[in-house]
Regions:
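Two-component/phosphorelay signaling modules centered on CheY-like receiver
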Residues: 15-33, 98
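Acidic catalytic/metal-coordinating carboxylates
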Residues: 37-40, 63-66
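Active-site beta3 strand of CheY-like receiver
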Residues: 48-54
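Receiver (REC) domain active-site loop signature in two-component systems and cognate sites
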Residues: 59
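As written
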Residues: 64, 95-101
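C-terminal output helix
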Residues: 90, 108-117
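CheY-like receiver
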Residues: 124-134
C-alpha cells in the first residue's frame, strides 16, 4: 500500500504536547490528526485515514496500552508508538506483546520521534522520506 502523505494520529491528554508534535510533523509534510484520549483516537481511526498512531501511556478513560489493543482490533496493521514519562520493564513488555512498533520515554527529542515515525512508516508501507530534520 503506497502512501504519498502519511497521516499521523497524535493521542495525548496534554494539548500542548499534541500541538508541539503537530508543529514537528506538519512542516515535514505529514498530515496530523489530534486526539485527547483513547476513545477519541478510536473514533478517528474508524472514520478517517490513519497511517500511524502516537499514543501517550497515561490518559483518562483508556490508557495507551488499552487504546493500542483496541486500535489493533480495528486496524491490525496500524503502526503504534507508545510514549510515557514513566516507563518500566512491565509496560515495555506489555507494549511488545500488544505489537507496539516502539516505546519512547518522554521527553522525546524532535530527531528521535521523527526517526522512529519514519522507520515505522517504512516498515509498514515501504514509505521513504528525505533526511530527518532536527
Amino acid at each position: 500500500m503506497a502512501i504519498e502523505v502519511p497521516s499521523l494520529l497524535i493521542t495525548d491528554d496534554d494539548s500542548a504536547f499534541r500541538e508541539t508534535l503537530q508543529g514537528v510533523f506538519e512542516p515535514q509534510g505529514y498530515h496530523t490528526l489530534l486526539a485527547g484520549d483513547g476513545e477519541e483516537a478510536l473514533h478517528i481511526v474508524r472514520t478517517q485515514v490513519v497511517h500511524l498512531a502516537l499514543l501517550d501511556m497515561h490518559m483518562p478513560r483508556l490508557t495507551g496500552l488499552q487504546t493500542l489493543r483496541l486500535l489493533k482490533q480495528v486496524k491490525a496493521m496500524l503502526p503504534c508508538i507508545l510514549m510515557s514519562a514513566n516507563l518500566d520493564e512491565a509496560i515495555i513488555q506489555q507494549a511488545q506483546r500488544e505489537h507496539a512498533f516502539s516505546v519512547l520515554r518522554k521527553p522525546v527529542t524532535r530527531l528521535q520521534i521523527t526517526c522512529v515515525v519514519r522507520q515505522a512508516l517504512e516498515r509498514a508501507y515501504n514509505w521513504h522520506a528525505g533526511p530527518a530534520r532536527s
